[in-house]
Amino acid sequence: AVSLHYTLKYPQEYGIESAPAVYGTVVTDEQAVKAGVENMEKALITFEKNKLSVENQITYDVLQSYLDSAERSAEYLWYDEPLGTVSGVQTQLPVVLSEYRFYEKEDADTYLDLMRSTGNYFDEVIAFERGKSEKGLFMSEKLADAVIEQCQAFLDMGNGNYLYSTFVERMRESGKFTEEEMGEYTKKNAQVIEEVVCPAYERLM
């Protein structure tokens, strides 16, 4: 849902009617990854490359390169690190959420559904990190301390957290909400932050 929203303003114009409001999944099954790559390759070769436009031939090559890379790296899934101090989940998720534009009222509903899935997503990350630890691949103590500090900094923002203020700003910018609706959505947003997002950060620590 996040990537789609940032890529297409109106996905329905491209025949995409709906997408699940989720961040994605933390994948650890090597065989599942390889099977997924194989299925995508089968779909890709149904297109005759020499009959595509130059632009689409480039897209074809990019997709093929991506699939080749995904297949080669499938056996190294446990070496991934979703909690990096610069581009980790704990630092990037609030930024991505705060920049999620509301073109229609439905976008705010999707956004709130996405926020509600934060707990499940973080639980997947936690399970992944435990798996890394069991395999002797856990991050260094210094990095772990830095991640904990970043999570604490997010929690310490309290009511000053920009996920509160930017939510209201985005509703105003869209011009799609009445004052009454903005009040209702603002309450829902605050509730999700307090009951789902913040507890997820606490568990991550």
Please identify what each model-predicted range represents:
Residues 1-205:
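N-terminal maturation segment of proteins
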